[in-house]
């Protein structure tokens, strides 16, 4: 594992709240920030690493253009999360009005275990309808 990858994982643990910020600031000045950013985006952890950098007051280590790009990316993650919240609330209300129970699975539900739920990137919304999927699909098609 490279030095940058080790620091990435340390930043991830800080962002998740499982590691207290330690004296890694001297190491941060030496990082290849473009590579850290690409790794974070590829792994879906860009907002979590951003949280760690904010906790460490380490933004000055990032080139300005990367800082702006990263901040914009975090805003996009938060916007998608809010949209998913609205969709999930609508689905939940719709199914409840038809007496169909819904269980939220994986991604979005797990976000509540994170220090900042809207910084947990989620793909789609996975739900279980307790064997009533076909009926639920038909109801949605009629709406």
Task: Spell out what each predicted region is.
Residues 2-9, 17-106, 133:
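Helical scaffold of the NTase/Pol beta-like nucleotidyltransferase catalytic core
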Residues 115-140:
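Catalytic metal-binding acidic patch
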Residues 104-116:
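Short, glycine/charge-rich beta-strand/loop segments that flank catalytic centers
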Residues 94, 102, 115, 140-143:
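Catalytic domains that recognize anionic headgroups
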């Amino acid at each position: 594992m490279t030095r940058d990858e080790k620091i990435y994982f340390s930043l991830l643990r800080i962002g998740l709240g499982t590691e207290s910020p330690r004296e890694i600031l001297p190491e941060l000045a030496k990082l290849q920030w473009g590579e850290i950013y690409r790794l974070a985006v590829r792994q879906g952890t860009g907002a979590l690493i951003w949280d760690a950098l904010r906790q460490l007051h380490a933004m000055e280590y990032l080139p300005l253009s990367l800082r702006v790009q990263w901040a914009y990316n975090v805003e996009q993650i938060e916007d998608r999360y809010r949209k998913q919240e609205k969709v999930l609330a609508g689905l939940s209300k719709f199914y409840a009005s038809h007496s169909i129970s819904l269980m939220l699975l994986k991604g979005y539900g797990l976000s509540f275990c994170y220090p900042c739920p809207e910084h947990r990137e989620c793909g789609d919304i996975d739900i279980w309808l307790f064997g009533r999927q076909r009926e639920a699909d038909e109801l949605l098609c009629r709406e």
